Every structure is written in C-alpha cells, then in structure tokens.
Amino acid sequence: MTTLRNVLGLFDGISCGQVALERAGIEIEGAYYSSEIDEYAITVTNRNYPDTVQLGDIKDRRDWDLKDVDLITAGSPCQGFSIAGKRLNFKDPRSTLFFDFVDTLNQYNPKYWLFENVRMRKDIEVAISTVLGREPVLINSGLVSAQNRERLYWTNIPITQPEDKGIVFNDIMIPNLPPTGELQEYFEEKE
C-alpha cells in the first residue's frame, strides 16, 4: 500500500480527492488539508471526513504553514475555460485561480501533483501546458460512468486511459421511480 505524509486538495469541493485516494488504496499518514470556500461543500466534507483540516480560501495560502506535502490536487473553477460557457478564459477572475495553484505548487514543491479542468480552447490548453511543463491527458468520464464529460488532467503521475466499463444511463436508474413531483414523497416513504 502506498502511503503519503500529507495531502493538500485545492478547490477541494466535497473532497472527491479523498474518495479517490481511498479507492486507490493510498493511505494518508498525516493530514488531508482542504482549501475550499463553499460552505455546503465543506459541510459534506466534514460529515464524510471529519479529520479534514479546513484551510479556507486559497488566497490566504501564504498564511498556511504546511509541512511535508506529498500530493497537491486541484480543479480550479472551470466556467471561464469551458467551451460551453462564454469562453472568457483568463479574463474571467475565476480562471486566474489557476495561477494560485501554480504558486502553491512552487511554495510546497510536492512529490506528486494533479490539476484537472474541462476541455477548453486549444490555445488556452497550450498556455496551461507551458506553465505546468506537462501535456494533459484527455479522459472522458463516459468510460467509467453514465455521463459524457471530457476532462483534461495535467500531472506528474503516470496515468493511462481507464478501461471502458460500458456503463449507460439505464444502469444507474432506479426502477419504477415516480415522476419528479412525487420524488421527495417517495424517498420519505422509504425512510
């Protein structure tokens, strides 16, 4: 089993990074640090992983005094990069949070790191690749789930395309699920 001393999840959401590490059989002997500002996401993380050390806003990273960070994961806000959005790219202030990730990488110099984001315009992808010194791996979540979401992963960890599990929408549907208006009543009856 692989063991990491400390892990830092930036833009950590509901700490899916912790779920992934658990499923991969990777143990954290020290702390899992989370930088997240959404109160609902923090609540979910704290319920599922009560030992998570909440650091708050990445903009306060210079105040953090973390030691022996072996892994940094990040998936900065994607709205500015998304082809489905307005494509403001780095003109969207949320997109510039990518540079906070880069500064944090330089500050802690972890053994491993991973940055995830949406599929984007090629020139922006190239710009991010240039800054990180790595080309991304494009993975479509449709290979492992019942959704079609292409994501780019920049990392210094060797990764390969996952095997297609052949999961389709009907595989995840609850049989005989009532119409949406009755959904809450349905689940209340099951409790």
Give the ranges of each region predicted by the language model.
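Conserved active-site and SAM-binding loop architecture
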Residues: 1-191
